[in-house]
C-alpha cells in the first residue's frame, strides 16, 4: 500500500479479494516461476503452487468460476504433473502460467505445443501474458482459447499501433502531415474521428489523449483480430489467416 505497510497475502485472502471485486473469472494463488530456473527450483515452485491451488479451491465457497494455473517452467514433465494434479479439483478453466517471463520464443512455443492439447477439452484454455499477433495464432493452433496481455495498451503508450497491414509507429516523421486514419479499414472511435497527423501531434505534446486514442485503437484491433480467428476456424480458413499474419507481423 501507499503507506509502506507490509501485507500478508494468502490463497484465502486472494480468493476473498477477488470475490469482493466481483471478478468474472478468479485465478488460484500461485507462484510464477522465474526464468531461468533449474529443475529442482522449478519443481519446488510448482509444488508450492499446487499446495496453494488446493487452498484456493477450498476457499472458494461461491459459484464464481475459478481457474487453475499450470506451472512447471520449461520442463514438460513438470508441466504434465502440474496439470494432472490440478485436474483433480475440476476447476472451471485451466491456464498456462509462467510463460513470457524472459524465455526464448522457441522454448515458449515448445511448452505450448507440448501441453496445449492436453488441457481438458470441455474447459476454457487460457494462456497468460502472451499477446503478439503471431504468438496468438501459434497458441490457437495448439488449442488455446483465451489470452491476456498488456501489449495493446503498453505499445499504444509508446506509439506502436496494430493495423490490418502490420505495425505502424506513429512517432515516425512521415506521419507528421498524414491526414489518413490509423487504419483506413478500421471502425474504431480513433480511426473514425482522428488523423494520424493529429494523433502524432498529441503524442509529441505528451497529451494524455494520444495514449487514450491509441489504446482504443489497439484494443479494438485485438477484438477484431480474435473475431477473425473465430470466423476462420468456422470457415476452415485458419491457414490463410495465419499466412496473412505472418506476412504482416513477422518482424515483431
Where on the chain are the PLM-derived regions?
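Alpha-helical packing segments of well-folded alpha/beta enzyme cores
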Residues: 14, 45, 49-52, 56, ...
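Structural signal for hydrophobic packing residues in well-ordered secondary-structure cores
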Residues: 22, 53, 57-60, 90, ...
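Generic structural signal for well-ordered, non-membrane alpha-helical segments
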Residues: 7, 11, 42-49, 79, ...
Amino acid at each position: 500500500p501507499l503507506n509502506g505497510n507490509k501485507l500478508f497475502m494468502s490463497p484465502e485472502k486472494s480468493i476473498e479479494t477477488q470475490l469482493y471485486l466481483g471478478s468474472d473469472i478468479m485465478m488460484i494463488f500461485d507462484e510464477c516461476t522465474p526464468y531461468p530456473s533449474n529443475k529442482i527450483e522449478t519443481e519446488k515452485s510448482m509444488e508450492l503452487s499446487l499446495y496453494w491451488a488446493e487452498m484456493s479451491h477450498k476457499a472458494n465457497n461461491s459459484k464464481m468460476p475459478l481457474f487453475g494455473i499450470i506451472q512447471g517452467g520449461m520442463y514438460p514433465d513438470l508441466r504434465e504433473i502440474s496439470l494432472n494434479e490440478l485436474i483433480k479439483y475440476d476447476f472451471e478453466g485451466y491456464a498456462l502460467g509462467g510463460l513470457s517471463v524472459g524465455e526464448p520464443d522457441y522454448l515458449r512455443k515448445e511448452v505450448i505445443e507440448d501441453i496445449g492439447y492436453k488441457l481438458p477439452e470441455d474447459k476454457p484454455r487460457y494462456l497468460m501474458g502472451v499477446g503478439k499477433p503471431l504468438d496468438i495464432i501459434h497458441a490457437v493452433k495448439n488449442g488455446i482459447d483465451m489470452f491476456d496481455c498488456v501489449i495493446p495498451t503498453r505499445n499504444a503508450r509508446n506509439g506502436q499501433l496494430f493495423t490490418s497491414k502490420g505495425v505502424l509507429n506513429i512517432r515516425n516523421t512521415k506521419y507528421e502531415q498524414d491526414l489518413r486514419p490509423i487504419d483506413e479499414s478500421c471502425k474504431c472511435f480513433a480511426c473514425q474521428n482522428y488523423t494520424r497527423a493529429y494523433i502524432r501531434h498529441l503524442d509529441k505534446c505528451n497529451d494524455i489523449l494520444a495514449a487514450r486514442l491509441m489504446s482504443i485503437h489497439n484494443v479494438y484491433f485485438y477484438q477484431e483480430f480474435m473475431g477473425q480467428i473465430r470466423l476462420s476456424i468456422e470457415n476452415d480458413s485458419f491457414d490463410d489467416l495465419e499466412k496473412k499474419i505472418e506476412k504482416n507481423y513477422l518482424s515483431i
